[in-house]
Amino acid sequence: MRKSLFWALVCLFALSQVGLASSSKHIVHYQIKAKLLPDEKAVAGEEILTWLNDSDRFISELQFHLYLNAFKNNRSTFMKESKGVHRRFKLDKKNWGYIDVKKIQIKDGPDLTTTLEYIHPDDGNKDDQTVMRVSLPEPVPPQEKITLHIEFYSKLPKVFARSGFYKDFFMVGQWFPKIGVLWNGEWNCHQYHLNTEFFADYGVYEVEIAVPGEYVVGATGKRVKEVRNEDGTITYTHYQEDVHDFAWTACPDFMEFREKFTLENPPVDTEIIMLVHRSHLNQKERYLSSLKNGIEFYSQNYGPYPYPTITLVDPAPGAPGAGGMEYPTLFTSMTFWWLPKGLFMQEMVTIHEFGHNYWYGMVGSNEFEEAWLDEGINTYSEIKAMAKYYGEDSSMLNTHGLKISDFVLQRARVMGIGKMDPILKNSWEFYSIGSYGTNTYSKAGLMLLTLERYLGEKVMSKIMRTYFEQWKFKHPTSKDFIIVAEEVSGQDLSWFLTSFCTALINWIMLLAKSDPRK
């Protein structure tokens, strides 16, 4: 395909997303060429980044996340906090990961590589290299753009914490130099911590991925081009607007399944892409059914899913650390070949991770500082979705007469260690990873269910839909959520939300009995 024809097709694709583009201000535009090096367990990359200074200040330096450097050695902040363990999965000390920025320069301008330095805004750990800063020869004026050319090499760790490899399976997330968020004229670019996830600005991603011919590839966005190269590799090009990240996966043992999914009310038209490892083919229909349920529930309750694709990735056996993670238009789920039908763990993970495309993907919450705005709201949504499709009292387990709901499990979790921290706190400052998870997921989700029972389901439904519509493709704070809740309900809710979010409260549950005389 000639280059001019290819970009004409890309333009047509972009026009087809005009409904999306009208909602998002494109702060970043990434053009990335990536080559998978299976023997080296690495990715060689070249990046053209155009960044908009969407502030009223002159900006004289740029800050970037280098997330993979969390796995560079045992002195990084992530490794010090985790001791090499994440969600019970352990680091292989023979297979570290890192990102090497070989060159960074202004396109057709000065080389900035010599100005590169690592900074440590959160904890002062001089051995941490997950945030870099470069100085500019001239500041970027307000509402002006700068374009950079970056060359990098990303060595992937053996996967135990989201990104990495296991044999010939690759989950490639947080893999390129990613510019931080300029928020209120200041850089918001935190280090990578054990408890933190990610935060970035919206824009456009055009990414070319070259892999050996036997590999099956899935990635953020829609595939717009596929070229078979003379050396036996295949280059896949993906394009997506109105996203704040780009992730991809590759494995020769993936079986790819595609199916169109549509809804009339609200109107949804997307393509489901499932990459199922051949050892889990017996679980394919469970993946498909639960993903359809997720798309339907979130679309009907919050707003129609707007992207042309959604990709479900089933990680290889031996790579559970890659499972249960969200990226824009792509997520990883998890299962086991022996998973019984009455245990809905696979369904819960699939619906939960898809749901992040709303509360992390389209509503761009700052997961470093206010993780509950994603994790808690999504847990609330997950509980309601699971109850709808799998039973109010059996949404997690329904077998041999034993029934357990998602709600009951979340409540039990809070009764364990939920009292250690308030919900609203910098993610790396929680007492422990257990307290972080319990408070930002379970306690926050139950807080919203309690609010629903206080206000009524109809009012709460309007709050959630209004919040999603007002803050889609933007960066809200907890204050913004409270404002929406108060405007929709017509009530002062500061007493309720601030007590849950910022205070430590132990709720004592007393046995309540109905009075037959009333």
Report the location of each language-model feature:
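Short, hydrophobic/aromatic-enriched beta-strand segments in well-ordered soluble domains
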Residues: 47-49, 64-68, 136, 144-158, ...
